[in-house]
Amino acid sequence: MNSSAFLAFLVNPFASFTSAFGSNGISNPVSGPSTGGGSTCVSGDITLSINTPGIKLGYEAPQDQMAVTESFVELFQVDSTFAADVTAGGPSVISGDYSIFVKLCLPSDPEILAQVKTVQLLTHGATLDHTYWDIAPGYSYVDVASAAGYATLSYDQLGVGNSDHPDPIQVVQATAQVAVTHALAGLLRNAELGGYRFDKVVGVGHSAGSTLTQGITTQYPQDFDAVILSGTSASAASVPLTMAAFNLINANTDPAPQFQHLPAGFLTQQSAAGIQFAFYRQPNFDEDAFRRQVAHKQTNTLGVLLTLGGIVAPSTEFTGPVDIVNGENDLVFCGGNCLYPTDQNSVALSIFYPAASKGSQTYIAAGAGHSIAAHKSGPDSFKHMIQFLQDNGL
């Protein structure tokens, strides 16, 4: 962090957030501690201009539950042509200005704050939001990172949480999410968030957020100095089982107040049991963290689901260190056993990152399901992630 920003932070931790913001600054900033209490954070909205290729999807958002369910029945049929048919409409352009919710957290300890040189860009998974990274006291990756001398920027993806919710089919697609993440990485690189300048930027993703982060290293290999990917593998064989467990519904039919304003096409899980089935392994998770995640459940769209595979390709030009972290019993991407028939972390590393540096690592979180952050082994996973960065001089 540059010295002038550090001095301003000591006088008023959020002075630099509320003065001299350009068009890329955080608007209406709100300051406060992290959920775990170990970080000092500012959150607010940032407007990003997006212009990226998309796909003209031949699909309209289903208006009732029978139509939602039938879409997934047809998508996962053994000889399905659903995805091919829907994505046959040709290219489109996704363009516009969108408000994205961000949360920048820094160490509360002034001595640690003075040493901050690296920021981690945290990208959550599908049906989650930025709170995944700071889910509960004792299960906050944000706080672990702060204690180790790192800044973090978490955010709500386009169409999620406090960010804008444009057309869930034609706009909220995977390429748009990549464009948002790329833009945020650029702002961090160029000291355009509150004037804070960081020497290094690390991309950290979970689940679909790992897919987006991996997509960044393929399309924009200079965005990140290192990446940490959790809840991911080279196989999507168990995704249909996950979708069945979710029993996705139009979010505006869910009683949760955060969904009442949404149009059809934004989908969420029907029940807490479905979330547990897909994301958790009993009795190895913290029940308070589980309840918090259920309370903060978010949305996904078929716009993303139908286009996510299009951004997946080996990151042949990314030469930085890569860390792949999975729960031992991840259902979504490992079918419940990430060590069967071989270590799926090592497979993913070799396929997606053939040019990664020798400092790359993998880690299996003992007894954890997909949502590693909320499991009892979560703190050990966080410790490993920080050690990986330190081992690589970041």
Per-range role (PLM):
Residues 156-171, 370-371:
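Glycine-rich "HGGG/HGxG" loop immediately N-terminal to the catalytic nucleophile
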Residues 25-115:
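N-terminal cap/lid segment of alpha/beta-hydrolase-fold proteins
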Residues 193-207:
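Alpha/beta-hydrolase fold nucleophile elbow
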Residues 170-195:
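Alpha/beta-hydrolase active-site loop
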Residues 358-394:
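Catalytic active-site module of serine/aspartate enzymes centered on a nucleophile-bearing elbow/loop
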